[in-house]
């Protein structure tokens, strides 16, 4: 997350929401009902971690809203009603998801304006081109996206539900076969760090 005109993002953090596994464990620590991003990572031993984005598509809107709230108020420290917002989406994102993103931005955060762009198109723009093919492999999904004059060609986009999280799963399987135990979401994050 960041601001137009900056050379780099102001904030980079994982799209994770963590909730206490047991109530009362964090007494005296100003326990919150949910932790987001790096704070969730740092307390992962006593939290259950959830990923609101699966295979590049938002699957839990309440948690996604928490991530956006954290982005505006904790990371960027801005009032969202004072800034237009550029959101990115995965190629072939369902129209209903785009509508839900728009609804939350306007109705919950009162943004004055917003635009939703496909991640691969912005990657191509960053390289100074408007036509090309982008291979985008993230945590949950990989895409090859042909782009012509700034427009993704939906009929030619290829999607593969194989990405970083699958590599983590495979590494976890190999380590489990060697006698290591992974039962909590926190232990899964340790494997992710090893990867």
Swiss-Prot record:
Originating organism: Solanum tuberosum
Extra information: There are at least 13 actin genes in potato.
UniProt xrefs under SMART domains: ACTIN (SM00268)
Protein name per Swiss-Prot or TrEMBL: Actin-85C
Enzyme Commission numbers on file: 3.6.4.-
Function as written in the Swiss-Prot or TrEMBL entry: Actins are highly conserved proteins that are involved in various types of cell motility and are ubiquitously expressed in all eukaryotic cells. Essential component of cell cytoskeleton; plays an important role in cytoplasmic streaming, cell shape determination, cell division, organelle movement and extension growth.
Family to which the UniProt record says this protein belongs: Belongs to the actin family.
Catalyzed reaction equations: ATP + H2O = ADP + phosphate + H(+)
Molecular function via GO: ATP binding; hydrolase activity
This protein's UniProt keywords: ATP-binding, Cytoplasm, Cytoskeleton, Hydrolase, Nucleotide-binding
Cell location: Cytoplasm, Cytoskeleton
Top EC category: hydrolase
Keyword check for ATP-binding: yes
Family annotation (Gene3D superfamilies): 3.30.420.40, Actin, Chain A, domain 2, Actin, Chain A, domain 4
Record's GO cellular component terms: cytoplasm; cytoskeleton
Name of the gene: AC85C
Pfam families: Actin
Principal location class: cytoplasm
InterPro entries, alphabetized: Actin, Actin/actin-like_CS, Actin_CS, ATPase_NBD
């Amino acid at each position: 997350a960041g601001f137009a005109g900056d050379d780099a993002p102001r904030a980079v953090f994982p799209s994770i929401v963590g909730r206490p596994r047991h109530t009362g464990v964090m007494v005296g620590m100003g326990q919150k009902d949910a932790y987001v991003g790096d704070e969730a990572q740092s307390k992962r031993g006593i939290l259950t971690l959830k990923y609101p984005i699966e295979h590049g598509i938002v699957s839990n809107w309440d948690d996604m809203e928490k991530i956006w709230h954290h982005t505006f108020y904790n990371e960027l420290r801005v009032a969202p009603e004072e800034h237009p917002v550029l959101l990115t989406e995965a190629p072939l994102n369902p129209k209903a998801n785009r509508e839900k993103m728009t609804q939350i931005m306007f109705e919950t955060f009162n943004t004055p304006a917003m635009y939703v762009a496909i991640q691969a198109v912005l990657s191509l723009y960053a390289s100074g081109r408007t036509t090309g093919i982008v291979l985008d492999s993230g945590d949950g999904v990989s895409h090859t996206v042909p782009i012509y004059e700034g427009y993704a060609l939906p009929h030619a986009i290829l999607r593969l539900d194989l990405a970083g999280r699958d590599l983590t799963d495979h590494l976890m399987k190999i380590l489990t076969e060697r006698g290591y135990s992974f039962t909590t979401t926190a232990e899964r994050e340790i494997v992710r760090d090893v990867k």
